[in-house]
Structure formats: C-alpha cells, structure tokens
C-alpha cells in the first residue's frame, strides 16, 4: 500500500498533503482494514521519501508498528530519498528498505527545482551524490547494504530496488529530470 497513491485518486487534496497520510493513525487504520484481506497484497508501503520531506524520523516505524498490529501477516516497507540523512533513525525497525534513486536524465550539479547548486553537503538534484548514470542505483544499493551490515540490521532488513524512469513530458519538465529515461540508459553503463 502506498499512502500517496491510494487516496490520490479519490481526493482533490494536493499530493504533498496526501502523501503524509501515513502519519495519521485513523487514515492508516482505515486503509489497512479496507485491504488487509486481499489475497494479492504483498507489502505495505509506509513512507514515501520521509527523509526528503523531513518527516519525523520515528514516523515510518510508528506506521509500521500500527500496520503490523492490524495485519501481522505482511511486512511494511520504507522508501528513502536521501543518501545519508538520518539513515539510522529512519531505517530502524524497517523490514524492507527501498532506496529511491533516479539517476537518468538529471543534472547532478544543479537543482532546476530549487535553483541551487548540489554538492555533497547540500542541495537536492533528485539523486543525492549521483553522477547521473545507471550505476548510481547499484552503488546506492551496495552502500545501503553495507550500512545495514555495520548496524547489525542486515538480517532483519531486506533491500528492494525501485529504479524508475519517467516518460511524461509534464513530469520531466517540472522536476529534476531534464529528459525521460531512454533504452540506452537501461542498456549502457556509461550513459549520462
């Protein structure tokens, strides 16, 4: 369950308001109760990039505990946006961690959204400290795997990859993407 997707199609509220629903106990309870008996439900998707939105670090874990109390048969997952913003705090207790890496079609040095430079210390270019190649996904997965091992959480937290490409001109032109992903991005290791 992705808290930003389910209500988005049933509501006229802005996405940023809807996507924070995972912090609302009543909303989470209603949504879990409405779908928990489905045989095709694999996993609950708690927070969509809570680190990038600076949600309270305890919010994803609180949602996961609530979800597990309502449906103990399915795990919850968490999708992180940032490379290293309060990683330990956000990931604590997460059964499935999904790094959200969008390397293709970005400008890794300058944010067109915020009109600011992106460095290792600051800035949001859509992919923290990426160079704009498909290997950024592999590198982030390896880095998160190593962090989980160092923390001793590698046996309790599974990594799932969520590479994404966007073809909508509306999305590409209004976000961090300078262009949509191409076949070459998927087939070449050196495409920027």
Regions found by a protein language model. Name each.
Residues 1-192:
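Glycan-processing catalytic domains of CAZymes
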């Amino acid at each position: 369950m992705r808290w930003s997707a389910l209500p988005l199609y049933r509501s006229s509220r802005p996405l940023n308001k809807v996507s924070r629903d995972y912090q609302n106990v009543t909303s989470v309870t209603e949504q879990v109760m409405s779908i928990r008996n489905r045989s095709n439900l694999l996993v609950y998707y708690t927070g969509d990039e809570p680190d990038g939105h600076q949600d309270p670090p305890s919010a994803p874990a609180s949602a996961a505990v609530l979800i597990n109390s309502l449906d103990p048969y399915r795990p919850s997952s968490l999708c992180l946006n940032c490379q290293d913003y309060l990683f330990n705090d956000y990931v604590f207790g997460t059964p499935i961690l999904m790094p959200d890496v969008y390397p293709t079609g970005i400008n890794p040095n300058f944010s067109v959204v915020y009109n600011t430079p992106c460095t290792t210390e600051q800035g949001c270019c859509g992919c923290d400290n990426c160079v704009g190649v498909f290997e950024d996904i592999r590198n982030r997965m390896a880095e998160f795997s190593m962090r989980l091992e160092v923390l001793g959480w590698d046996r309790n937290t599974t990594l799932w990859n969520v590479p994404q490409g966007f073809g909508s001109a509306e999305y590409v032109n209004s976000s961090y993407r300078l262009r949509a992903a191409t076949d070459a991005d998927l087939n070449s290791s050196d495409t920027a």
